[in-house]
Amino acid sequence: MSDHIQFKVEALDIKAMRYYTPGDYEVDKDEALLRVTVTTMPYVSEMAVALHEIVEATLCRVAGITEKEVFDFDQMWNEEQGHLYGEEPGADLRAPYRDQHLKAEEIERLFVEAAGMDWQEHCQNVEGSM
């Protein structure tokens, strides 16, 4: 595990994402590179989602939650039936990274507000990118 990490942020079409999500991250085997991918959307929303992913990944690492645990839970959640439109796997009570996801969302909201964008507009941008 590296004490230093590099970030790489990319905006991709939803079809190029690992699964159906507006934001994702992967950590390399040495944990020296955090690759964050977001769906293509207006700049402030792209940066807000990227920030969310960076914060969530960092908090998970500090808590000892692996990227594989997050990915596996997200995959399981996405395969389940009956989730409402707009729900996210990280907000599910069963998510091993729920606390980290919710903290990342708080910071995402603060960023969106500081950038002068309404939260509902940001949510529409995210939904429109998928």
Features from the language model and the residues they span:
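Metalloprotease/metallohydrolase-associated module, dominated by Zn2+-dependent proteases
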Residues: 1-47, 61-130
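Active-site recognition of the HExxH zinc-binding catalytic motif
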Residues: 48-60
